[in-house]
Amino acid sequence: MSTGNESYNLRYPKGFKGYPYNMYKLEGYGTPKGYITLIGVVATLTVSGLFFAKTRSNKREYPTHNKEWRAKTLAYAKETNADPIYQLPKDKI
């Protein structure tokens, strides 16, 4: 019985049983490897997204942002907003 391929006949003599009959099963043909990879990628991205969302929601304030700093910032904001150059005319609203 000839396979039609001379290099195959030279490499694997008649009766050679080193490889299974169905090479596709050996290589994983028919198994959902693509789906498993996709599930792994989605799971990794989901876990990392949840982790970073949690770390962003649990951010500590800066050590310099104390009560005095907040009060001065609010006073500056009120002073800036009171400046008429920042006020839109009523007809533009």
From Swiss-Prot:
This is Cytochrome c oxidase polypeptide 6, mitochondrial. One of its GO terms (biological process) is oxidative phosphorylation. Residues 54-93 are mitochondrial intermembrane. Component of the cytochrome c oxidase, the last enzyme in the mitochondrial electron transport chain which drives oxidative phosphorylation. The respiratory chain contains 3 multisubunit complexes succinate dehydrogenase (complex II, CII), ubiquinol-cytochrome c oxidoreductase (cytochrome b-c1 complex, complex III, CIII) and cytochrome c oxidase (complex IV, CIV), that cooperate to transfer electrons derived from NADH and succinate to molecular oxygen, creating an electrochemical gradient over the inner membrane that drives transmembrane transport and the ATP synthase. Residues 2-33 are mitochondrial matrix. It is a single-pass membrane protein. Pathway: Energy metabolism; oxidative phosphorylation. Belongs to the cytochrome c oxidase IV family. The keyword Transcription does not apply. Component of the cytochrome c oxidase (complex IV, CIV), a multisubunit enzyme composed of a catalytic core of 3 subunits and seevral supernumerary subunits. The complex exists as a monomer or a dimer and forms supercomplexes (SCs) in the inner mitochondrial membrane with ubiquinol-cytochrome c oxidoreductase (cytochrome b-c1 complex, complex III, CIII). The gene is cxfA. The chain crosses the membrane at residues 34-53. Its main location: mitochondrion. It comes from the Eukaryota. The keyword Ribonucleoprotein does not apply. It is found in: Mitochondrion inner membrane. One of its GO terms (cellular component) is mitochondrial inner membrane. One of its GO terms (molecular function) is oxidoreductase activity. Keywords: Membrane, Mitochondrion, Mitochondrion inner membrane, Oxidoreductase, Transmembrane, Transmembrane helix.
